[in-house]
Structures are given as structure tokens and as C-alpha cells.
């Protein structure tokens, strides 16, 4: 309970259940649930994200980071944050309600026309232009993190891994994001800046066109090896030349030659193909019809074992927690975290150099291996010992696992290059 003391603030004694009424659950993830709710004082519809801090101890720094970043943002293209309340071990985060679902939801009934895609990308670019002007990097741009209001307004969400660029820290080298959307320089743990978001936007553009990002049929670990090694993905198929050129501009492997968000807003694909955001309500209506016809009832989520899951309701989830590589916290929540509404002067969160690959790569891979061994009748003792060795090494030398992974990636890339060279000379 010691880490909860950092949440002490003027709202800690206020019972959020007196201020807000919970309605249907509209989202669920590994460390929280989201409800549609009502602000009893204003009767305004809100989204209520409830997190059990005791169960989400490993994600506390992500939660703090999301609150810190959102409390500093004031833009129509960023999900609005109204405040946070602590009741026992439950943290209530009050957010703007966006009932149109995510851009990923809107892809489920079928492919999108380029006019819809360009309009969504334009609004994402406006959000990125704002963030980058505030020296912030989102670091996890993808369709699942783009939410829409019922009127078609498009807003960026999920700032748990967002980063702050300070005057003395022009580029970051933290290994975070979602593998399929990650820029090469992020995977290589080189210094990077807001241009990493532009790469992720290019992958998101392909996702909006094809329904999934490139390499989605591969294991995320394999993708981490391939992205720095291979040529950039391209938009294949019957798409307009401006759209293909837009994607190509975003997916330049050299971040110096990627355009900024402001420059991309002037790209001909954006200027020629877009419409008003109200046009996107057609996609929202299409998704609602698709759901009402009984599609998408079976959830592939690991959390689908809860009875009567309201995520299958008419609106669909407006807040999801997809697999993302996030910095693993070494410390707990710092005292003075903004929990009671916007505070523009909040300091950037300082992260300890713990290895992110433990929770995002090592443990999932060991989990898959152990499951396969169990199915084939084999033992898992040796695998558990090896997995524990990673944890022990991390305790004595924080960050060592990430260094190991970086060397493995480099070694595999060199091996693949040498093998390809030998094959070509035979």
C-alpha cells in the first residue's frame, strides 16, 4: 500500500461514486476497465477508467505517465481528461466519452475508401502536430489508439508510453511502442524524436487500407528483427498514387528525411481526398449495423471470459489495452502526480532503466513455449528456470535484458546478411 501514498491529493477523500454514475462497461484490458458514465453534477456523459492499483502495480508508472501527459494537453484532437479520484485501491480516471469506437473498430465490417482514410489521417496529423509542438511524442500510434466521437470527431488516445522531449533531451532512446508499428530507430534503441510517430502513422495508413499492419502474420519477436533489416513496407494494390506516395514519405528509414506532421497536412493525399469529419459518421453507422447483424460477437480477447461482456454492445469498446511495449517501472508513483485536473506545469516523468523486453517479449515467448511443451507432454521446469534467470539478472543489473536483446538483434541481422551474401555468390 505504500505506493498509494503518492496519490494523496484533494480528491483522495472524495467518493467518486457520489460524483459519477457507472453505466455499461465499454472496454477492458490487462489492468483496467472502462465504463460509460454520467457526471451527476452536470449530467454530462463521460468515460470512467477504473484501475485496481494493487493488481496493476507493474503498470503504475504507465498510469502516472498517461495522467501527466493528458493533464498537460489542451487540444480538440486529444482525448480530454477531467480528473482522477482514488477510492481505496481503485483509481478512477474520468475521460471524455467517445462513443464512435476506435478506427480499428471501423475497419471490422470491411475495407475503407480512400476518402475515409485520408480524413482520419488528417485528424491524426492534427493531433500529432499539436503534440510535437508541445515537445511530446505519442510513441504508440495505431488504429486502436484513435477514437471517434459519435459526431465523427477523431482524437488520439492511450498516452501510457508517451514521452516528453526537454531542451536538454532532444532525442530519446527508450524501447517502447507496439512491434508492428515501431520505427527502425526505436527498435535499434538509437536516439529518436517525434519522427518515430511519423513512421507509425505510415504503418497505420497501411493498416487502415488493408485491415492490418505489415507483417501481422509473423510473431512480434520476428518483426523486431525484420523492421530494421528489411526495406520499408509499401502500400500494395489498387490505391491512388497520392496515397502510395504519402505512405512512402512516412516510411523513410532515415528519420531525417521523413516529413513533419505539419508538412504532411499539406500533402496532396490529405488536401485532395479529405472531407469534413461528419462524413465519418457513415463509417460509425456501418459498424453499428454490422454489430447489430450479429457480427463480432465472439471476442478473441484474453479477457473475454467475463460473463455478459458489454464490449459487444452497440458502441463497441472505446478504450482498449492492446499489447504494447511499455517501460517497466522500477520506482512507484511520484508524490504530487496531477490527479485533480489539468496542470500545465507538470514535470515529465523520469523512468528507471528497467528492461521492457521482460514483459513484452521474454515472458510471452516463455509462456508460448511452456504451453507447447505441456501439450506435447513435456516438462516445463527447465524453461521456468531459464525465465527466472532473466528476472534475477534484471534485479541485480537493471536493463541487462534489453542490452542482451539488442545484441541478439544485431547478431541475427549480421548472420542473415552473411548467409544471404554467401547464397548470392554461389
Swiss-Prot record:
Top-rank taxon: Eukaryota
This protein's name: Serine/threonine-protein kinase 25
EC number: 2.7.11.1
Similarity comment: family membership: Belongs to the protein kinase superfamily. STE Ser/Thr protein kinase family. STE20 subfamily.
Subunit architecture: Homodimer. Interacts with CTTNBP2NL. Part of the core of STRIPAK complexes composed of PP2A catalytic and scaffolding subunits, the striatins (PP2A regulatory subunits), the striatin-associated proteins MOB4, STRIP1 and STRIP2, PDCD10 and members of the STE20 kinases, such as STK24 and STK26. Interacts with TAOK3 (via N-terminus); the interaction promotes STK25 abundance at the level of protein expression and/or stability.
Underlying gene: STK25
Organism of derivation: Bos taurus
Modified residue annotations for Phosphoserine: 278
Enzymatic reactions: L-seryl-[protein] + ATP = O-phospho-L-seryl-[protein] + ADP + H(+); L-threonyl-[protein] + ATP = O-phospho-L-threonyl-[protein] + ADP + H(+)
Biased amino acid composition, Acidic residues: 299-314
Region listing for Disordered, in residue ranges: 292-355
Alphabetical UniProt keywords: ATP-binding, Cytoplasm, Golgi apparatus, Kinase, Magnesium, Metal-binding, Nucleotide-binding, Phosphoprotein, Serine/threonine-protein kinase, Transferase
Co-factor(s): Mg(2+)
Chief subcellular location: cytoplasm
Coiled coil: none
Residues modified to Phosphothreonine: 174
Amino acid at each position: 500500500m505504500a505506493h498509494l501514498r503518492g496519490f494523496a491529493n484533494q480528491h483522495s477523500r472524495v467518493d467518486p461514486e457520489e460524483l459519477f454514475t457507472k453505466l455499461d462497461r465499454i472496454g477492458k484490458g490487462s489492468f483496467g476497465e472502462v465504463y460509460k458514465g454520467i457526471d451527476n453534477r452536470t449530467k454530462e456523459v463521460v468515460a470512467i477508467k477504473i484501475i485496481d492499483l494493487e493488481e496493476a502495480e507493474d503498470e503504475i508508472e504507465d498510469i502516472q505517465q498517461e495522467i501527466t501527459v493528458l493533464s498537460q494537453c489542451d487540444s480538440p484532437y486529444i482525448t480530454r481528461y477531467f480528473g482522477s479520484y482514488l477510492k481505496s485501491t481503485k483509481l478512477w480516471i474520468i475521460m471524455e466519452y467517445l462513443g464512435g469506437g476506435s478506427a480499428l473498430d471501423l475497419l471490422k465490417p470491411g475495407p475503407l475508401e480512400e476518402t475515409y482514410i485520408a480524413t482520419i489521417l488528417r485528424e491524426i496529423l492534427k493531433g500529432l502536430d499539436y503534440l510535437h509542438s508541445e515537445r511530446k511524442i505519442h510513441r504508440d500510434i495505431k488504429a486502436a489508439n484513435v477514437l471517434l466521437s459519435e459526431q465523427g470527431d477523431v482524437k488520439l488516445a492511450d498516452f501510457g508510453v508517451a514521452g516528453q522531449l526537454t531542451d536538454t533531451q532532444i532525442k530519446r532512446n527508450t524501447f517502447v511502442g507496439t512491434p508492428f508499428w515501431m520505427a527502425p530507430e526505436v527498435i535499434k534503441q538509437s536516439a529518436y524524436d517525434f519522427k518515430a510517430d511519423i513512421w507509425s502513422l505510415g504503418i497505420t495508413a497501411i493498416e487502415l487500407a488493408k485491415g492490418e499492419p505489415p507483417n501481422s502474420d509473423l510473431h512480434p519477436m520476428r518483426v523486431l528483427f525484420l523492421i530494421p533489416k528489411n526495406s520499408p513496407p509499401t502500400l500494395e494494390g489498387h490505391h491512388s498514387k497520392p496515397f502510395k506516395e504519402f505512405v512512402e514519405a512516412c516510411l523513410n528509414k532515415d528519420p531525417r528525411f521523413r516529413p513533419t506532421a505539419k508538412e504532411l497536412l499539406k500533402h496532396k493525399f490529405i488536401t485532395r481526398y479529405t472531407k469534413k469529419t461528419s462524413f465519418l459518421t457513415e463509417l460509425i453507422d456501418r459498424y453499428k449495423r454490422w454489430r447489430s447483424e450479429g457480427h463480432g460477437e465472439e471476442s478473441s480477447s484474453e479477457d473475454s471470459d467475463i460473463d455478459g461482456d458489454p464490449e459487444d454492445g452497440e458502441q463497441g469498446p472505446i478504450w482498449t489495452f492492446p499489447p504494447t511495449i511499455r517501460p517497466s517501472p522500477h520506482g512507484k508513483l511520484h508524490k504530487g502526480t496531477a490527479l485533480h485536473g489539468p496542470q500545465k506545469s507538470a514535470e515529465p516523468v523520469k523512468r528507471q532503466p528497467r528492461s521492457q523486453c521482460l514483459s513484452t517479449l521474454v515472458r510471452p515467448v516463455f509462456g508460448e513455449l511452456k504451453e507447447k511443451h505441456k501439450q506435447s507432454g513435456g516438462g516445463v521446469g527447465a524453461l521456468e528456470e531459464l525465465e527466472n534467470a532473466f528476472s534475477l539478472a534484471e534485479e541485480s543489473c537493471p536493463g541487462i535484458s534489453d542490452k542482451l536483446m539488442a545484441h541478439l538483434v544485431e547478431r541475427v541481422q549480421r548472420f542473415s546478411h552473411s548467409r544471404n551474401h554467401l547464397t548470392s555468390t554461389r
